[in-house]
Amino acid sequence: MVTTLFSLPNHKFRIKLLFFLILNLLSLHTSVIAHSSNSKFTKFTRHPNSDSSSRTKRSTFSNKGFLNSVQLSLDHALLARSLAFNLTLSHRASQTLMLDPVNDCLELLDDTLEMLSRIVVIKRKDQVNDDVHTWLSAALTNQETCKQSLSEKSSFNKDGIAMDSFARKLTGSLTNSLDMFVSDKRKSSSYGVIGGRKLLSDHDFPTWVSSSDRKLLEASVEELRPHAVVAADGSGTHRSVAEALASLAKGSGRSVIHLAAGTYKENLNIPSKQKNVMLVGDGKGKTVIVGSRSNRGGWNTYQSATVAAMGDGFIARDITFVNSAGPSAEQAVALRVGSDRSVVYRCSIDGYQDTLYTLSKRQFYRETDITGTVDFIFGNSAVVIQSCNLVSRKGSSEQNYVTAQGRSDPNQNTGISIQNCRITGSTGTYLGRPWKQYSRTVVMQSVLDGSIHPSGWSAWSGNFALKTLYYGEFGNSGPGSSVSGRVNWAGYHPALTLTEAQGFTVSGFIDGKSWLPSTGVVFDSGLL
């Protein structure tokens, strides 16, 4: 019998050999592109150690050059996915503890490949599409998340180091693709200073919400005609939410699942391939999905989520999401969302540390209660949180932080916008602290109670990000709204101008006018 790579008895040797071959293929591929491009990309990059083929002069941007850059990122992502897939097979056989974070990377790479493929299709038609900015920003966030998951495991070994190396290589090429795109967009009159678009006029709903989805959000349960009904007592089509999700037909249409009143002890994952899923409950506190995974319990932050929604077009209405791990469990996510154009409406999200993980892409939260302690709203999406109750609860720490925004690149169109909310809770609460170098958070037209610390915002560690972050306030009220005692950082803006504040509205920040109307959620598109 002929011996091949995949018939060798030692799986560790197979993985080592596969890794060696992938590295050589990557090196050869990079050299060929660099030679054929005649150093086209050698003069422009913020990552001088990344491939020369992923660089270009800012002054000589072309659609072809940008496509070459994205194609290189796509090739890197394919190689990284191949490594991640084979590592997961090896880990299943050996029951290695690295399985969880490599699985995270695999899921995130699948999402990245889909977004990069869309970009290639759009740009080959020479179309200017604002979705490209969101997808590149999210692809970069995915690699940062992969590296974060790997770093959280104490068993970080040579396999993890290999996966981390590929994630860093892909990060470099994605950074340069994003740099090229934003450089070109800045030359266009449609480019806005904040969210990457010019500001749009007020409208009842962001335009990315279709009229049919809008009707669904306001419809009664009887009018919904759900595709599946979940009831613990057996009166529905399924007894568990996971069973109902698995039963949904594949396709691009809207799938509605009604969750009857009750408590469902499940951990759910809606993958990127499962799009346009709508979960509808019977009301806050009536329909409850609860899990208890936590960092202290052995789960990394990404995998700790009670409910994870990665498929685009996710909608949740009238549901309570809970992580019951407790105040000493460290990171314990109740809801993680990496779904583009997602809506969470009239829900409750309850936890302690890291309650709501707004991972990536465009998101909107309305009339939702979000409760937690440390960094209880965090991530790197472009998210507007509007007309919500943000409650800082008593935990194991003396200090609480409402937000920890994770923007790692100045060209990402991401950030947290809190508008017309009530922020209340225990004493010693800060509005936020910078998780990443270019953290961006704005609180505007909201009521801040006396629990807010006079300085308003807190450092993460020393002087980290204090000059590069973007924190702002506009038109707030209540005992904690005075900016007279606020921090004196270069990146803090105590009084945003009207134009600056408009850039963080539903219309200005998440292009809500193009997609929210279809979901049916009530929203304010501009300033109040």
Each model region followed by its residue ranges:
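Short N-terminal segments immediately surrounding and downstream of signal-peptide cleavage
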Residues: 37-51
